[in-house]
């Protein structure tokens, strides 16, 4: 699924990845993430509030997609900044 990130006080997304699901499900999975000063995702929890399909075969690829996201580094950012990645899965992708 394709992901979009938000909630990091205006930090810009540098790179995002996409992991394909192994089943034929559709829906949105919201992943709560923690990002360090370097812009790397250091923690991810898939299936938080806003998720429309919490099928296990979507949660794992959503979490992997979130870990592939990278934000630009920010030396003024907290050591652990919380945000979200919303991954939209469509049938057949």
Give residue ranges: language-model regions:
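A short, well-structured alpha-helical segment
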Residues: 7, 23-30, 34-80
């Amino acid at each position: 699924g394709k992901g979009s990130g938000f909630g990091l006080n205006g930090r810009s997304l540098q790179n995002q990845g996409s992991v394909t699901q192994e089943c034929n499900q559709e829906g949105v999975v919201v992943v709560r993430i923690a990002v360090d000063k370097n812009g790397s995702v250091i923690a991810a929890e898939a299936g938080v509030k806003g998720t429309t399909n919490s099928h296990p075969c979507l949660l794992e690829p959503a979490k992997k997609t979130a870990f592939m996201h990278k934000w630009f580094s920010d030396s003024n950012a907290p050591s652990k900044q919380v945000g979200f990645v919303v991954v939209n899965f469509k049938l057949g992708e």
